[in-house]
């Protein structure tokens, strides 16, 4: 019997092609997701060297960052964005890579499309030229973002040079309170470990609270692993995983499905395996969370207050808090529930799935968006949009005063028409609150879909549990 292994090490070792003297490893890549922003130079590199895409059938492309979420019949107004999307179309056609075009109902955010199509599978190595590739770790896949030069390397060789990571376990036991979601879990974890806490590690999430999450919830948790500084996030696959994947287009079928299930059931950390770092948290202690500053680690319970830099002993941290509060235009000690907002964004690869929209619609039903707030709902894919519309969720949002959009990355980042104006404050279900992330001078508060809707209704950051019963 060999040494007990962690889930990460099982996947890593099964994909090793070669190990160099300095410890650098060549690993095989099972799946490669491609989008329009980080791929043009990679395809050009192949063209210049006369190379082909080695495994086009293990590659899937979709445009998401630059696509408009309003009337698509008018095309893409911004020239640079249009060129990038057109280049993805021509490059994938030239190199034989499957591409979900903008008018394809399967189009959407790459990290929502991959799982939806069954392209994401347990035990696989998955890469994409995008930091939030960690999302796919929810399936027990080793998934991480890569740079443009690495995109070219994977296209050409289906392999990648990497140094092995350390192992971190984040165990969250106990039951979640009513109104607390997967988004609150991961924000609380980042608040605990900081944005550098996971540096050099792959984080495995485990415990009763994690096992109790749906696949959508697990994807939300793994999505923001990168905001905790980690290389990737992992959750061991189980019956919830298998049920989600069954029958999806790229998932195994028939005897191959049964064989896959048998293998996937081995993808769990062995008893006695040792982690480099272990973090334990009580799910029952987690409240709805909200960020107050310009880093995902600047997070407090929604029932809390804006921190006072004077209470921080470390000069560097004190200065960082002061700078963040100046940018966010917040006063120390101010209750977070008194912070007024201008915009609400529900969507992104963190919270743009059908479960997120159902949770949001349940709170929006029978209520109205405040007159001072502009609120938009952006489904994560065409299939999510179709499902939501079949359930009447779009009508609930529209009647409440939300805008109902086409799928895309939208206001998560200022690379398309959906942006904040300088000084505008947004309650956002996305994953980053850096200065200017949603538009130059824009101020971002990261929240769950429930908090986002409640905030849209009251015009200030609000816990959905505190709302009066709706009339709907």
UniProtKB/Swiss-Prot annotation:
GO molecular function ontology, one term from the record: 3-isopropylmalate dehydratase activity
Catalytic activity: (2R,3S)-3-isopropylmalate = (2S)-2-isopropylmalate
Entry EC no(s): 4.2.1.33
PROSITE patterns linked: ACONITASE_1, ACONITASE_2
Cofactor binding note: Binds 1 [4Fe-4S] cluster per subunit.
CC cofactor: [4Fe-4S] cluster
Pathway: Amino-acid biosynthesis; L-leucine biosynthesis; L-leucine from 3-methyl-2-oxobutanoate: step 2/4
UniProt-listed Gene3D superfamilies: Aconitase, domain 3
Binding annotation for [4Fe-4S] cluster: 349, 409, 412
One Gene Ontology term from the biological process aspect of the record: L-leucine biosynthetic process
Keywords for the protein's UniProt record, in alphabetical order: 4Fe-4S, Amino-acid biosynthesis, Branched-chain amino acid biosynthesis, Iron, Iron-sulfur, Leucine biosynthesis, Lyase, Metal-binding
Function: Catalyzes the isomerization between 2-isopropylmalate and 3-isopropylmalate, via the formation of 2-isopropylmaleate.
Subunit description: Heterodimer of LeuC and LeuD.
Family: Belongs to the aconitase/IPM isomerase family. LeuC type 1 subfamily.
Protein name: 3-isopropylmalate dehydratase large subunit
């Amino acid at each position: 019997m060999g040494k007990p292994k962690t889930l990460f090490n099982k996947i890593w070792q099964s994909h090793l092609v070669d190990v160099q003297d300095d410890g650098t490893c060549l690993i095989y890549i099972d799946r490669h997701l491609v989008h329009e922003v980080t791929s043009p130079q990679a395809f050009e590199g192949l063209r210049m060297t006369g190379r082909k895409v080695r495994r086009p059938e293990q590659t899937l492309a979709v445009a998401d960052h630059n696509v408009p979420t309003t009337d698509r019949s008018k095309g893409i107004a911004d020239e640079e964005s249009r060129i990038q999307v057109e280049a993805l179309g021509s490059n994938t056609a030239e190199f034989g890579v499957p591409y979900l075009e903008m008018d394809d109902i399967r189009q959407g955010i790459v990290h929502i499309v991959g799982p939806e199509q069954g392209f994401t599978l347990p035990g696989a190595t998955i890469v994409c030229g995008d930091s939030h590739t960690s999302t796919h770790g929810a399936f027990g896949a080793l998934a991480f973002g890569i740079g443009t030069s690495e995109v070219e390397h994977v296209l050409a060789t289906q392999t990648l040079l990497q140094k092995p990571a350390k192992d971190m376990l984040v165990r969250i036991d106990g039951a979640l309170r009513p109104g607390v979601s997967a988004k609150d879990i991961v924000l609380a974890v980042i608040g605990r470990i900081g944005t550098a806490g996971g540096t050099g590690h792959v984080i495995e999430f485990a415990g009763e609270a994690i096992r109790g999450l749906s696949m959508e919830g697990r994807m939300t948790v793994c999505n923001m692993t990168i905001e905790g500084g980690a290389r990737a996030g992992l959750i061991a696959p189980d019956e919830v995983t298998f049920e989600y994947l069954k029958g999806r287009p790229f998932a195994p079928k028939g005897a191959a499905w049964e064989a896959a299930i048998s293998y996937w059931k081995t993808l769990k950390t062995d008893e006695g395996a040792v982690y480099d770092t272990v973090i334990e948290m009580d799910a029952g202690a987690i409240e709805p969370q909200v960020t107050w500053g310009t880093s995902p680690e600047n997070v407090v319970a929604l029932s809390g207050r804006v921190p006072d830099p004077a209470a921080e002993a470390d000069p560097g941290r004190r200065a960082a808090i002061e700078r963040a509060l100046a940018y966010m235009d917040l006063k120390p000690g101010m209750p977070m529930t008194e912070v007024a907002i201008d915009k609400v964004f529900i969507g992104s690869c963190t919270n743009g799935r059908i479960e997120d929209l159902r949770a949001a619609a349940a709170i929006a039903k029978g209520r109205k968006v405040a007159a001072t707030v502009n609120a938009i709902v952006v489904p994560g894919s065409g299939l999510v949009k179709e499902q939501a519309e079949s359930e009447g969720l779009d009508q609930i949002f529209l009647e409440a005063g939300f805008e109902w959009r086409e799928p895309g990355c939208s206001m998560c980042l200022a690379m398309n028409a959906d942006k904040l104006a300088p000084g505008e404050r947004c309650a956002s279900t996305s994953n980053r609150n850096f200065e200017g992330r949603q538009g130059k001078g824009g101020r971002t508060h990261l929240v769950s879909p429930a908090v986002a809707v409640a905030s849209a209704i009251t015009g200030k950051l609000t816990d959905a549990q505190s709302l009066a019963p709706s009339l709907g």
